Each structure stands twice: as C-alpha cells, then as structure tokens.
Design a protein with these regions (language model features):
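A short, charged, amphipathic alpha-helix used as a generic interaction element across diverse proteins
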Residues: 82-100
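Negatively charged, low-complexity tracts enriched in Asp/Glu with abundant Ser/Thr
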Residues: 1-46
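A short, exposed loop/beta-hairpin motif centered on an aromatic-Gly-Thr core
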Residues: 72-86
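Short amphipathic beta-strand and strand-loop transition segments with alternating hydrophobic
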Residues: 30, 52-60
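Short, mixed-charge low-complexity intrinsically disordered segments
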Residues: 104-127
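Short aromatic-glycine-(Arg/Gly/Cys) micro-motifs in beta-strand/loop hairpins
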Residues: 58-75
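Non-catalytic tandem-repeat scaffold regions and their flanking low-complexity/translocation tails
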Residues: 40, 100-101, 114-115
Length: 127
C-alpha cells in the first residue's frame, strides 16, 4: 500500500452495523496488508443504490478511525445495514431472482446446486 493521506470514511463500521458517526454499512471482508489491513465494504444506500469500496487501516495511525478510502465499483451486493432480517431477506430475494433469470437460459445442474447452496447458507447465517 502506498503512503497516502488518511481520511475518515463515514460508511465504515465496527461490525455492529453503525459506527460512531451513525453511518450504515457492513464490513464483510478483512485482509491483512503490510502496513495494516484492508476491509472491503458492501452495502445499500436508503434508496437501494448499491456501493462497494475498500478501506485501508494503518497500524501506524494514532486512532482506528483514520481511514483511507478508494472508490470501488458496484458488484454483487448482499448486505443492507439495518437489521439481520433485512439483510438476509435481501440476499434471499437476490438469489431467487438470479435463479429465475438463469433458469430461463437453461442453467447447468452445477449452477443450480450452487445457487441452492447459497440460499441454504443465507438461511443458516447469522448475518
């Protein structure tokens, strides 16, 4: 990670759904890097717009709330930082839609099994 100025990222959370700024979001991937760690944040805005971006935390900064953000691209977004039910329901809705769309184009048995497995994971997950 190259040295850059660290800035606060309003949507980064401590994993409890809200941070000290009252911002929403879900950090779902944490990667160790040389100078600290990187977290990839996924989520939805109130209007349903999805977002995804990386947050870098430096071990050398004086507080854990000094973050550096990089603009990310919208990908497969599966969490909405309101309630566990909302999050799981949104994941399930997206998987169901994906399954329906793919079934129209004659998906393979492997793909169907993978989607069923994803839905089962969501049902059992403590998101």
């Amino acid at each position: 990670m190259k040295k850059e100025k660290f800035v606060k990222v309003m949507r980064a959370t401590d994993g409890n759904g809200l941070n000290q700024y009252g911002a929403k979001g879900n950090v779902i991937m944490k990667t160790e890097i040389d100078e600290g760690y990187k977290e990839t944040v996924f989520g939805f805005e109130e209007d349903g717009t999805g977002y995804e971006y990386d947050v870098y935390y430096s071990k050398t900064t004086d507080t854990k709330y000094k973050w550096q953000a990089t603009e990310g691209s919208t990908g497969l977004l599966i969490c909405f930082g309101k309630t566990q039910a909302t999050c799981a329901d949104e994941v399930m809705r997206r998987l169901e839609r994906m399954h329906k769309v793919l079934s129209y184009i004659n998906i393979s048995a492997n793909m169907a099994n993978m989607l069923d497995h994803c839905k089962e994971l969501v049902r059992n997950a403590k998101i």
